[in-house]
Amino acid sequence: MRCMRMLPALVIATAALGGPAAAQEHAGHHDAPAPQTGIRAELIRDVEMLEEKYVALAEAMAGKYDYRPAEGVRSAGEVFMHVAGANFLLPAMVGVSPPESMKAGSMEEMMASMRTLEQMTDEAEMRKELAHAFMHARHAIAQVPDGELDEMVQVFGSPASKRAALTMLVTHMHEHLGQSIAYARGAGVVPPWSAGSGAGGN
């Protein structure tokens, strides 16, 4: 969660980039072919696995998106939309613009976009947003050529390679998948991939 507490630094770094984002992507945004080998291919495969679990868990938790284990923490639905927002916005660190519908002309607009996502209440629309955000993340990784992976960029105010920034994008998804699994268990929902496993699984 440390990276999301530092989100304002990302906002400042990406303030020149341009509600809910299931609308249009930039023209040509998804033209980059998916790599077949190398670190980007491995990251994309990881994102695909994460997407399957997030989507399955979001479906399984239908009707329980308002569950939260304690006051003052995000609800299950807010966590899903937090992940969606990060998938749209974190790729900006490596130069991949968020969808046009994610307002990013200023810090205020960027933060408003994040808040708007986390305040969604229509569960069907939230699941669409989540799926769209994973698509954006996959295509963002594909857009960064292997030859640029060692280029240095600013990541939350500190220098890091594009490789490290893309890895952070994926580890952030893992972090909140664990959180979402704990939320599901607390709400009495067994993660679909664990159902029938006997030992309970994740």
Residue positions per predicted region:
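Bacterial N-terminal signal peptides
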Residues: 7-18
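Amphipathic alpha-helices that form helix-helix packing interfaces
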Residues: 50, 57, 86, 130-133, ...
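N-terminal pre-domain segments of enzymes
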Residues: 25-38
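Sec/Tat signal peptide C-region and signal peptidase I cleavage site
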Residues: 19-23
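Acidic/histidine-rich alpha-helical segments that form the ligand environment
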Residues: 111-153, 161-173
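Short, contiguous alpha-helical
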Residues: 44-55, 64-111, 152-202
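Positively charged n-region of N-terminal signal peptides that target proteins for export
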Residues: 1-6
